[in-house]
Amino acid sequence: MKRTFQPSVLKRNRSHGFRARMATKNGRQVLARRRAKGRARLSVSK
């Protein structure tokens, strides 16, 4: 059986990367929440 997680750095960054987050209003809200929480990493790419 094929596993469901087939890693790809490109797909990962395009959907969850910093620039993808900054591109939409809701994405910026995600970053703001993570900053407020004090996350060391705001997104997978940065």
From Swiss-Prot:
Keywords: Ribonucleoprotein, Ribosomal protein. GO terms for cellular component: ribonucleoprotein complex; ribosome. GO terms for biological process: translation. Pfam families: Ribosomal_L34 (PF00468). It comes from the Bacteria. GO terms for molecular function: structural constituent of ribosome. InterPro entries: Ribosomal_bL34, Ribosomal_bL34_CS. PANTHER family: LARGE RIBOSOMAL SUBUNIT PROTEIN BL34M (PTHR14503:SF4), MITOCHONDRIAL RIBOSOMAL PROTEIN 34 FAMILY MEMBER (PTHR14503). Belongs to the bacterial ribosomal protein bL34 family. This is Large ribosomal subunit protein bL34.
